[in-house]
Structures are given as C-alpha cells and as structure tokens.
Amino acid sequence: MEETKTIKEKTIELIDALKATCQTYGMGNDGNEYKIITQVFLYKFLNDKFGYEVKKVSTALKNAEKWELAYAEMSEDDRLDIFDSLPSDIPLLNPEHLIANLWNQQAKGDFDLIFDSTMTDIADKNIDIFSTQTAQNTKIPLFEKLTQYVTDDTARAPFARALVDKLVNFSFEEAFEKHYDFFADIFEYLIKDYNTAGGGKYAEYYTPHAIATIMARLLVGNATDLHSIECYDPSAGTGTLLMALAHKIGEDKCTIFAQDISQRSNKMLKLNLILNSLVSSLDHAIQGDTLIAPYHKSDNGQELRTFDYVVSNPPFKMDFSDTRERIAAMPVRFWAGVPKVPAKKKESMAIYT
C-alpha cells in the first residue's frame, strides 16, 4: 500500500512538472495545453508498460542492467519474436521510440523534430489498435506533433528537452497491477484543471469518479454472472461513467461503446480507456454528434445498436440551433419532440421538451 502511495505521489509530481513546463513556455491554460499534458503522460505510461511486458517474455531483457540498451542491441528477428509474444493491448515500440533513446539525443539541435517524429511514428506503427475514430471513419491517431504549439521556433527544442527531462525520474512498472483503483484517481487529477480552465466547458462532460462509482453499483447491483456485456454512453465526455461501470462488471467481461461530439473529450476518453486496460474498446470510441449521426449500429448495419447498460450525463443545456431542424426531421427517433430555438441565450437551450 505504501509503495503504491509513493508511486501515486510521484505520478502527481510528474503531472505538476509537465504543467509547469507548459507554463514556462507560455502555454499555461492555453487551449493546447491539455493535448501536450495528456499525450506526454500517455507516452510515459506506454513506454513503461512496454518495458514491463517485454521483460516478462524475455529473460535477457529482464536480467539486463539497462534493458533499453539490450533491446537496441537485439536483432530485428529477435525483436519481432518479442512482438509476437506480447498481449494485443501492448503497443509495439522500436528502440528509437523509447524514452531512453530520446534522453540520449537531447543535445542535438533539432531535438524538437526528433521528439515530434518519435511521437508520430509510434502513432503510425500502432494505429490499427491504438486509435479512435470519427463518425465518418477517420482514424484519430494516438499522438500528434506537439512542439508546433510553441509559437517561438527557437524555443521548440528546449521545450521538447524539458518534457523528456521530466519522464525519467521514476517508472510506472510497480503500479501496473493496480489498474483502475490507482489510475482512476490519477486521471481525475490529470484533467482537473481542464474542467474549468483552458478555455473549455469541461464541467459539461465530466462526472466525478465518486458519483460514477455509485451509479455503477446501482446499475449492476450484486450481479456476478456477467459475460460479453456491452456498455454505452452517447455523451461519453471523458468516459468516467463507463470506466466505473466496466470496473464494476469486470474489464475483461465487457466492451465499451462511446460517442461524443467533442474532440477534446475524445482525447481524454482515449487516455482513460488505455489507463483502465480497455484498449480493445478504443475502436468503439467515436468522435461525432450522437444526435444527428449516431455511429453504433446493430450487426446487420440497419438499426441502432442496443446495449446491456446505457449511462449518460449529457449537458442538459447547450446550443444545438444549427442542427435543430435535422433532429426534428427524425420524429420516430425523437418521438417526444425537440425543443424550440429560444430567441435569446441559445447556449442555454434545453435538450428536452
């Protein structure tokens, strides 16, 4: 328990340090700050997860003083054999993708380009599994170029160095068996500043973990014989309701389906799914308007899909005046009616009649 607490404290220190770096380079409370924080944190998590798993399948790496160096010295065939032995929810990383490799290249003048290309190369290599998508089936990769958000070109390489410098102080390896109970709190801490800051309206999309847990207990009750369960949230936000439900049911017994119009929510949801060992559900995390373009269909592709559990905490007031008539043109689906567009304060437009 004390060991986990120490790791948790170090994780919080890492998040604070990454936010401080963004502040130093002029992106504190900037609209792009959350992209940097969440993606760099996720990179650290996946790097350590990969290291943890490869040492389980390779005695040579497990016994190496520096496993990253031993991994880099392996033949390509040996590395491919390791890839074949890894669970499907583990990203495939080459030696040049590892944090240790970036650390060793920090002195190079174009380190910002090296950092960005590393992130995008990881995303490209793992896009089949580690990606979400839009309602139009466009893949949303795991990572993107991050130093582009620093306006001053000359500050981009130092910014990248400052980020990598924060990632080498500890490893998540000791905490990976804690799963939800450890990382749920971390996720809540990670996004807390973006609930009100950064130009966003995250209060509309976020449900506190404690409330989500109570809702999951009420829904599932004492049911234990649960298998192949499908859970859905049509306004998923950061996915907290779905994570609590999956934890109550059992992550290995359910599949998550989600949709939300917000690009930012989708990035947060992606992080949440990965932290909670629900990588297999990433493909079902859709960014798009649930009202006019619901993505999840039945197996025959004709009707809307039905689910075992549906949870939702939608924004009960929002401006959907642009799509109101399209929604009203679907009376079978919206049989209870569609609210009229108010003359003033469209942002307070009710979502129900």
PLM features: residue spans?
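Non-catalytic, mostly N-terminal accessory regions of nucleic-acid modification and defense proteins
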Residues: 1-214, 218-219, 281
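Short, solvent-exposed loop/helix junctions and linker helices
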Residues: 157, 304, 345-351
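A short, mixed-charge helix-start or loop-turn motif at secondary-structure junctions
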Residues: 197, 255, 338-340
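Conserved S-adenosyl-L-methionine
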Residues: 201-312, 317-328
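Phosphate/oxyanion-binding active-site loops and adjacent basic polyanion-contact surfaces
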Residues: 207-211, 346-353
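Mobile active-site "lid"/loop adjacent to the S-adenosyl-L-methionine
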Residues: 316-350
